[in-house]
Amino acid sequence: VGEPALVALLLGKSAQADERGIALTITEDTYLPSDADNVPLIPQEMITVLGNMIDNAMDACDREDPWVEVSVSLQDHALLMRVADSGTGMDAAEFARAMQRGYSTKAGREPEQHGLGLALVAQVIRRHDGELTADVTYGSVVTACVPGRAG
């Protein structure tokens, strides 16, 4: 995988998924060089974005045989992070609400403890003029794309 912070995050999330009975797969094309000049996010931002995306995906896996698939790569000088899961996904309106601080799909839980993850993801992505999108295929797919640094 290359980038040490990404390796540590993926190892930790893999262990969490295993404890929860979720099949977490890292795609074969996942790779980020450890050369920070090529990556548009600093490691802490990458952990915030990808960590929250994976957490949300694991929480959304409500089908039998739950799974999450993670892909991270540099494509055309842009950082592309994609997390797919076996959950039902969100329509466009719900996804837009989920990017607002305080909104949570996790019913019955303390509101002050939820509704921050996707808002933080969106904040980091917007700060770097990136794009955060969601699609529903067999499950849900959330993609964060951050353009490369100029210069």
Segments and roles (model prediction):
Residues V1-R20:
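Short beta-to-alpha transition helix within the HATPase_c
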Residues T25-V49:
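Conserved short strand/loop->alpha-helix "switch" segment adjacent to the catalytic nucleotide/phosphoryl-transfer site
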Residues I42-D65:
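Conserved ATP-binding N-box helix of the HATPase_c
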Residues M90-G102:
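Short conserved segment of the HATPase_c
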Residues L120-D129:
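Conserved glycine-/histidine-rich ATP-lid loop and adjacent helix of the Bergerat-fold HATPase_c
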Residues H128-V136, S140-V141:
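Glycine-rich ATP-binding loops of the HATPase_c
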